Amino acid sequence: MADSCAENAAKGTENERPKEVEASADTVPQVEEGVEEYLKRKNMVLLDYEKQMFLDLVEADGLLVCAKGLSYDRVVISILKAYSDSGNLVLVINSSDWEEQYYKSKIEPKYVHEVASTATERERVYLEGGLQFISTRILVVDLLKQRIPIELISGIIVLRAHTIIESCQEAFALRLFRQKNKTGFVKAFSSSPEAFTIGYSHVERTMRNLFVKHLYIWPRFHESVRTVLQPWKIQSIEMHVPISQNITSIQSHILEIMNFLVQEIKRINRTVDMEAVTVENCVTKSFHKILQAQLDCIWHQLNSQTKLIVADLKILRSLMISTMYHDAVSAYAFMKRYRSTEYALSNSGWTLLDAAEQIFKLSRQRVFNGQQEFEPEPCPKWQTLTDLLTKEIPGDMRRSRRSEQQPKVLILCQDARTCHQLKQYLTQGGPRFLLQQALQHEVPVGKLSDNYAKESQTRSAPPKNVSSNKELRREEVSGSQPPLAGMDELAQLLSESETEGQHFEESYMLTMTQPVEVGPAAIDIKPDPDVSIFETIPELEQFDVTAALASVPHQPYICLQTFKTEREGSMALEHMLEQLQPHYVVMYNMNVTAIRQLEVFEARRRLPPADRMKVYFLIHARTVEEQAYLTSLRREKAAFEFIIDTKSKMVIPKYQDGKTDEAFLLLKTYDDEPTDENAKSRQAGGQAPQATKETPKVIVDMREFRSDLPCLIHKRGLEVLPLTITIGDYILTPDICVERKSISDLIGSLNSGRLYNQCVQMQRHYAKPILLIEFDQNKPFHLQGKFMLSQQTSMANADIVQKLQLLTLHFPKLRLIWSPSPYATAQLFEELKLGKPEPDPQTAAALGSDEPTAGEQLHFNSGIYDFLLRLPGVHTRNIHGLLRKGGSLRQLLLRSQKELEELLQSQESAKLLYDILHVAHLPEKDEVTGSTALLAASKQFGAGSHNRFRMAAAASRRGRR
């Protein structure tokens, strides 16, 4: 099935395969012998198409885009081994944790260096050479501070290159590297062709950010790939499992409601592009993420009905997935959540449709019979799986004359929940497992049906080692399992619908407790699918497959495994195949990547047809499951066609690799015009040319390198100086200090009072403090909540605005800047620095510390300054006169109201200050008038209350200046 689907996807595009592969094919025979000897010496076993990938990237830097499952990881390992030498310094960036651990395990430890925690230690490690897996944020700071010898870097390897955008830290590091190193290599890898179809000119922009000129395209239908995999084709058997009438009807009704909502959202929003909103996309794509990205910029302009429909489409899709993949009891419990009165009043109205009523009715019928007795229907694939394990596979072993061997079966599932479901079914039987699910989900069982009771009575005592202690402990842990990084959309949906208090394992090893005969008598065996004939192997808790197999040397092995795991990612399947060497693989769910991994694994083994593993595909024909699989193939094929077409039309400048200074001429430079004849003619006669202007500098706090703004500032030609500062985030000039806040950070800082303290420090040390409120460029330039369906109301937004108003009242010198995106912020910083002096890093680092800066004279006690500023009648325009002439706090308390009026130059301010110091004034409830608004501002920002002022005033009588 895998080959046929891939071959069908390749029709019409075989003539459009990458030209660089064809062009380099003639050069392969000339170096073939040398390459084979080199790979053998380095102990690198590669398939023919992997060798070609390796040769292409060694010959010229470039971006390699391959199909999922073709495993470019061996090519990466080969390149890492080729540069494994203490005389080379190779950096690997943008790798996930499991990728880093996997690659490190394949390289000699003496060439791999761990990243040190201190800057001094990192400088020493850099000079030792070898391979470095380093965080991009640390790398950027070290490059800016010149802790790493940039000119000595041999090259950089970039993984997951489809995520490299102009403003990301990886692009920043590559730009810093290429500006000072013109000889090092850049080799990038990606296995996500669909990502390059999003946005305008994504392929060209990614290559420009990577500083590469060559694009290598390797789809599954590439001629070299087909030539390698076709001779070792896996034995695939496609088994169409029929679904029950109830599931078919539920699926039809859900699709009917989704179609109605799609038409409704298009009718309401005729002026908005809703091309991506189709029933097919709602079912098979990451619909909610795509639609959210499309509507984010106008989300605040949409009416409430549209927002409810978008949320309901996601819910309906979850119901569809739950019906297809979960057991009947879990699906019914999930459906019940959306039949409550509270939800009926908060959705778009789909629960009132006749189709919705049928969905709830049919879901209940899957659990209870006509007499309302508990009789849940089993999952359609359960019986087929049991037949495979007890009849088909033993019979095939007998027919192939491998009776003396114990079969090893690998069952692949989509997610950990399905894996746990199958483990419970195989070890406990269907009736017992479904009854446990009913009790767990609080489904009222009531009375058991006669048929179900008889099936349950066939159960004997619970089998030994049904589940290990570790599994029991994990199931008792509260809190649902978070979605894995990199998990595909189906697994995310399944994890979203998990009940709270559950945590599922990703691998189980089982063995048969009732061995099935493989002789002639096996034909008459009719095993009871509801009686457990399997038990778990506890040794797999330590992820030791070898020990698990050794513990049961004469029994069949059955391994349950997810397509990818949190610990090893997509490498988990390849690792399991190498350790287990299965005879049979059962694809309980469909996955394109896993199918190709099986093909590549079989091509590496090069076994005769009789010894190759058999792969059984369990699939519901003409259902959403089959449609999702075929759509994923079609999307990948269309993505590769788009990339191939883009490459044929792409114009790549010769300087794009950054090895000449032409690549950086587009960056803003602040040097004078070149001293050519035209430039000299424009100068006044006899005048000497002006001195070269200094590149503008911006001091950036180290914590700000988590954002995109430092990268964009550098791209505009400003020099970025990373520094640990305690006041502000960006220092533009000696007088301008900027505190940057995103919307979510702004709300949190206003509520906690942290922003108030930050403004106090900025106003104390800088003449022009600035609060920068920066919006996400992909979100509307409008105050709203963080999430797509925000619970923030206009009242909550008004509360934020009121707090900002109080902040500006309390700090008159504070300026607010509203920026729609980091790009606009970078341009604004450049304009603010025009004609201004440069900031001093030493002065900026010393401000806010306990020790005064060089030449700074502390005129006033900062504690007294802050205390007086909080008193009514005292503000920034009169506090300095009060501090100079008021003497001490004790003398201030002894002054009359007339004397205070002379100090403050205001009768009203003097009265307010005198009353707060001498009169037992307690404000009435809800009374905030006149200048006492400043007191309210102090309360808003956690600065204290009137009682605290009275206590402080009493204490100040005993204080000294």
UniProtKB/Swiss-Prot annotation:
Gene Ontology cellular component terms for the protein in this record = nucleotide-excision repair factor 1 complex; protein-containing complex
> Which keywords does this chain's UniProt record carry?
DNA damage, DNA repair, DNA-binding, Endonuclease, Hydrolase, Meiosis, Nuclease, Nucleus
Q: Where is the ERCC4 domain?
A: 697-777
Q: Where in the cell is it found?
A: Nucleus
| GO BP, sorted A to Z | DNA damage response; DNA recombination; double-strand break repair; double-strand break repair via homologous recombination; female meiosis chromosome segregation; female meiotic nuclear division; meiotic chromosome segregation; mismatch repair
Q: Which InterPro entries match?
A: ERCC4_domain (IPR006166), Restrct_endonuc-II-like (IPR011335), RuvA_2-like (IPR010994), XPF (IPR006167), XPF_nuclease (IPR047520)
Under the heading CDD domains, the entry gives: XPF_nuclease_XPF_euk
| EC number in record | 3.1.-.-
Q: Where is this region: Disordered?
A: 1-27, 451-485, 674-693
The principal location of this protein is nucleus
Biased composition regions of type Basic and acidic residues, renumbered to the chain: 13-22
Q: Which GO terms describe its molecular function?
A: damaged DNA binding; protein heterodimerization activity; single-stranded DNA binding; single-stranded DNA endodeoxyribonuclease activity
In this chain, composition skew of type Polar residues spans: 458-469
Q: What does this protein do?
A: Implicated in recombination events during meiosis, mostly in meiotic exchange. May directly resolve Holliday junctions within recombination intermediates leading to DNA exchange. Also required for the repair of mismatches within meiotic heteroduplex DNA and for nucleotide excision repair.
How would you summarize the oligomeric state and partners of this protein? Heterodimer. Interacts with hdm.
What family classification does the UniProt entry report for this protein? Belongs to the XPF family.
List, alphabetically, the NCBIfam families matched: rad1 (TIGR00596)
- Tell me the protein's name: DNA repair endonuclease XPF
